[in-house]
Amino acid sequence: MLKPKKTFGQNFLKSKNIAHSIVELLDVKEDDTVIEIGPGLGALTEFLYQKPKKELILVELDKDIFGLLEKKYKNATLLNEDASLVDLSSYKNLKIIGNLPYNMYASILINMINQEKHISKMVFMLQKEVGERLITDSKDKSWLWAYANTYFNIHYAFSVPGRFFEPVPKVTSCVLVFDKKEDTPSFEKQNYMDFLKKMFSNRRKMLKHKLNNIEDKYALKRVEELSLEDIKYIYNTLSCFNKNIFTSTPAL
């Protein structure tokens, strides 16, 4: 039995019931191409492998685990790659699932959102605190909340206590479902991300002190007071009106 590696942030799910429940959330159909990120010892893979589908792709960075998966799941496509860099451009209507490593979740999630046009649905297990910040509309929301919710409807499925993992983490996990929105903006994603990061830095600043040509109705507001629709509207309006959106360059 392979031991979890701290360098990869590995915590292996050991409950078959929970694994089955997570896989069922993905709603796999016969014509679906499914990608699993970080299969580990195969808790989710076992159930995915049994389902009728077009193709199952396993993305695993750990070479030791990759070798075991290659022997066990011969009818799956295996990629020994970093999920934060994997290219999805040759696929469409992907369904993606995974227990994301606590120390790599952000880079993986960003890579998936960057390629959202190739994705129809995602189901991810994350640290509970992280998951809650992705679905909140409170003052605790972040730039990643805005970025993810621009392209996906996200809902909280259930929590998973640490005792169901090996080794036992100090935090509780949760499962989120990301359903691709039908109408998404055609923003240039890197520019939009940069805008969001700057907007959410110095978050107590009023917008009139951060943005050039901001409309009066937003001037005295802070980013934490804005809805997602407000944020998208401001970006779309200012990026079309003036490339020099910010009054200065706030630290990221």
From Swiss-Prot:
GO terms for molecular function: 16S rRNA (adenine(1518)-N(6)/adenine(1519)-N(6))-dimethyltransferase activity; RNA binding. Its EC number is 2.1.1.182. GO terms for cellular component: cytosol. Belongs to the class I-like SAM-binding methyltransferase superfamily. rRNA adenine N(6)-methyltransferase family. RsmA subfamily. It catalyses: adenosine(1518)/adenosine(1519) in 16S rRNA + 4 S-adenosyl-L-methionine = N(6)-dimethyladenosine(1518)/N(6)-dimethyladenosine(1519) in 16S rRNA + 4 S-adenosyl-L-homocysteine + 4 H(+). This is Ribosomal RNA small subunit methyltransferase A. PANTHER family: DIMETHYLADENOSINE TRANSFERASE, DIMETHYLADENOSINE TRANSFERASE-RELATED. Keywords: Cytoplasm, Methyltransferase, RNA-binding, rRNA processing, S-adenosyl-L-methionine, Transferase. The keyword Endoplasmic reticulum does not apply. The lineage of its organism: Bacteria, Pseudomonadati, Aquificota, Aquificia, Aquificales. SUPFAM superfamilies: S-adenosyl-L-methionine-dependent methyltransferases. S-adenosyl-L-methionine binds at N11, L13, G38, E60, D82, N99. HAMAP family: 16SrRNA_methyltr_A (MF_00607). InterPro entries: KsgA/Erm, rRNA_Ade_diMease-like_C, rRNA_Ade_Mease_Trfase_CS, rRNA_Ade_methylase_Trfase_N, rRNA_adenine_dimethylase, SAM-dependent_MTases_sf. It comes from Hydrogenobaculum sp. (strain Y04AAS1). Specifically dimethylates two adjacent adenosines (A1518 and A1519) in the loop of a conserved hairpin near the 3'-end of 16S rRNA in the 30S particle. May play a critical role in biogenesis of 30S subunits. The keyword Transferase applies. It is found in: Cytoplasm. Gene3D superfamilies: Ribosomal RNA adenine dimethylase-like, domain 2 (1.10.8.100), Vaccinia Virus protein VP39 (3.40.50.150).
